[in-house]
């Protein structure tokens, strides 16, 4: 079993009482990265495959100081040695995490860079340049009236961690929207919980923040079935639609509770 959730005080993605909106936790700098050798290799393999078939690197108004600060930070702080590389993208290709950089200028904020090979149902080329408010608009129940304040907190404080989860029926980490998803089949159920660990790191002197996105799968033996069923049962229709479970929630809950 992955040790992803074995750290003290780490919230379990669906056991701690929320269904859609994730909780933020401030973490010490030594917990920014988590390295598991077998999972690391799987991520690198799937990232390489994704780069052959989809747009993964995007950029808009990324200033050179912020780019260089992030590149140096990754080379110096990553838990295993990375080969020095002149470009930020070449550094990220050696990591299990995907990377997004958000920039802040006065009251204006925007996604300035993305190197995202394993997205969760979104296209980097459609999100580049957008405000934080626009990036998260589809999430039901989220209040982004003070989105610029949230970006400022990310840039000047932290690092912060949160987990986002979804139920999937494919044994893969890449859920780019161009790849068809397998629907739930009650006669041949194969169920996973995909967990995205998001960590933010601020670069106040360069007016930006770094998002580290790391994908993991919990298999059927690792899923807490009663807790997952309870979380799904609590969702309203908007939340079920957002999670992609609107058409199978009842059957899925029944399967979780009866097997």
Give, region by region, the residue ranges found by the protein language model:
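Extended, well-ordered protein cores
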Residues: 1-259
